[in-house]
């Protein structure tokens, strides 16, 4: 069940009204993954097939991917759950051995996927194409702000953050390039540290969204 108020796979259930309990899941995720247990550091999660469609080269490619610089330059944590292309699995293992703020589980673990959705502050999903996409909807439901590329279902379900008004439910990038992903994650991390009231309001807005989630899921199943 993808519902933070009823999810039996997370340590602490919560709603938009009790969103402070979300923090328990973050601390549990940090501890489980061997990260510094610190509520103040923004945690970015990704759950993905390690396939070209998902923008993995732009994140993880050894020569030009942005993951290494992101983790070196920004005071953030990065948790990865996924499996797929061998080169990418190997590169993630290399990154993990060199970066104390990047931790990964190569494979699939259903309970961990729920903990990442509940415990992350942001969810990275820079897909090359995404007809519908479910993870960004789970993220919104769990008050975990999506960082997505403007394509398909991602563009339809995530409203880009407006720094002036504080409106939005996530952070949207237009171009699938390492620099664009780096910049957009950096923007989210900046907002985390400097626009805390905006972030909290966005989480509330995300959790309360009614955009036909069930209908979208049904359409996805039909496809």
Regions inferred by a protein language model and the residue ranges of each:
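Catalytic cores of carbohydrate-active enzymes across secretory and cytosolic contexts
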Residues: 1-223
């Amino acid at each position: 069940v993808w519902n933070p108020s009823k999810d039996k796979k997370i340590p602490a259930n919560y709603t938009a009204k009790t969103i402070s309990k979300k923090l328990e899941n973050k601390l549990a995720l940090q501890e489980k993954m061997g990260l510094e247990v610190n509520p103040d550091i923004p945690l970015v999660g990704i759950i993905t097939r390690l396939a070209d469609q998902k923008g993995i080269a732009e994140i993880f490619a050894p020569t030009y991917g942005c993951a290494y610089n992101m983790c070196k330059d920004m005071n953030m944590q990065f948790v990865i759950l996924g499996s797929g292309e061998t080169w990418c699995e190997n590169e993630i293992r290399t990154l993990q051995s060199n970066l104390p703020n990047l931790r990964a589980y190569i494979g699939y673990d259903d309970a961990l996927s729920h903990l990442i959705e509940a415990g992350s502050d942001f969810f990275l999903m820079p897909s090359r194409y995404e007809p519908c996409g479910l993870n960004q909807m789970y993220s919104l439901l769990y008050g975990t702000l999506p960082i997505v590329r403007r394509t398909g279902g991602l563009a339809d379900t995530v409203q880009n953050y407006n720094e002036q008004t504080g409106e939005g439910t996530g952070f949207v990038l237009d171009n699938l390039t390492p620099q664009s992903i780096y910049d957009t994650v950096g923007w989210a991390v900046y907002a985390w540290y400097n626009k805390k009231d905006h972030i909290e309001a966005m989480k509330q807005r995300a959790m309360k969204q009614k955009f036909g989630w069930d209908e979208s899921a049904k359409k996805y199943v039909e496809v």
